[in-house]
Amino acid sequence: MPLTFPDYHAEAPGGAQGGRSMVTRPFDGRELGARIKDLGSPLPELTVFGIMLGSGKDIVHFMRATKSLASAAYVAKRLSKHFLDVARHGRGMTLTNGNALAGRLAKSAFDLNIPLWLSSPVRELIVERGAVRGAVVARDGRDVRVLARRGVVLACGGFPHDVARRQKMFPHAPDGTAHWSPGPEGNTGDGLRLAEKAGGRVDDTLPNAAAWVPVSITTRKDGSRGVMPHFIDRAKPGVIAVTRAGRRFANEGNSYHDFVQDMIRTAKPGEEISVFLICDHRALRRYGLGCVPPFPLPIGRHVRSGYLKRGATLSALAAQTGIEAAALETTIAELNKAASEGRDPAFGKGSRAYNRYMGDALHGPNPCIAPIAHPPFYAIKLVIGDLGTYAGIKTDAHARALDADGRIIPGLYAAGNDMRASWAATIPARVLRWDRHSPSAISPAGIWLKKPGDVRAIRSYMRTGCSEKMSSNRPTLGRS
């Protein structure tokens, strides 16, 4: 469904102020029946009481729950339904975002009696006379030869957790380890390696090999590590980002990808690429920060764990974080002077449509700018992560894999994050896309067109959503 969400560069030629971005509609998980147990849970860092908030009104109402009776009523209803679902089914049944996408696709597959094998990794592709004829799949303790009538689609989620390929393609992580991805840990580049063994080419020439996102590292209640992507908080009024030198370096309200590129450009050679989000008590309790929730939820656990740094003064906060105190105080003083008039002469925070959309519409005159003046003060460390990889298998316009000489490999297709992305220097907008292919080709979602003009499958595809990730070794249907 369309959103009023603006393009990331809405002011650029051809940019749109809203209405072009698409998101999945919420999906009732009860439609999956007993198979709901196979659907991965949302990332804990992106949930509220276990609820994955959908893009749009969900986030708006939850952010305004203490300021609006209408929002408070909406949140109360949403929470009541969620806890009732948990009591009855063991999990929430209002699926949003990636969960809704995976759930709808799975429901369509089950309705068509399409078998879906979980925990069944591909061992190798079957190649005969230069064409891919199928795959050897490990299932129930034995290898099974699966032959394909028309072709094999590789859609294994890219390589966000392939340390060797990260080392080669991520300039900010020369040893492959200084990078954190919230993506499934099973996405280790299996599809790319399978393609290479079959003669395919992985394009590693892109200026950005992934969709960069600033993340913070937290410890979950069960002791495991969590990776929190920072999408919304950076744009809020009363929140800025600084380097260890105590200076701002970018418009904090810009897209996650642009923000990380600024992080990389600002870093000195050989030093850790990290920055700190800074805010005061008023902003923290009004909007939250990273994994830290807004009022009325408690924040003590995050302070005790060290995830959230707190200081009674800016100099005390600087001492805890290693930020240069004098420079930080100067930066805040300069910000506060301009913020009283709703201006940001240094970086123009709030000057772009995307900034304003992610800010606070109830705050004026600039929805992204406010003084940082109410102690105590807080900081969270940000490092570099990704939302998915861009470098991938080189294909033609019909998703057919190409070899090193640009020739089609018969029977082999790539989709989603296994396919080389159509952009890499920057990200123009948040989108879902679908493609119609010739009768001889298969779409990224695995839908066959039996003859020219046969659009029945495409209509079903559009009605249920579209997917870009199906891992060869993940034990669940979907997660995010």
Segments predicted by a language model, with ranges:
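Glycine-rich loop(s) and the adjacent beta-strand/alpha-helix scaffold that form part
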Residues: G92-N99, D111, R139-T218, W434, ...
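An anion/pyrophosphate-binding glycine-rich loop and adjacent beta-alpha core
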Residues: D7-Y74, L192-L194, A198-I323, A327
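A glycine-rich dinucleotide-binding beta-alpha-beta segment and adjacent secondary-structure elements
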Residues: E124, A131, A327-S422, T426
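Short Gly/Pro-enriched turn/cap motifs at secondary-structure boundaries
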Residues: P182, M228-D233, N254, L382-G392
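C-terminal structured subdomain/cap of oxidoreductase catalytic cores
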Residues: V144-R145, R149-G151, G288-P294, L387-D454
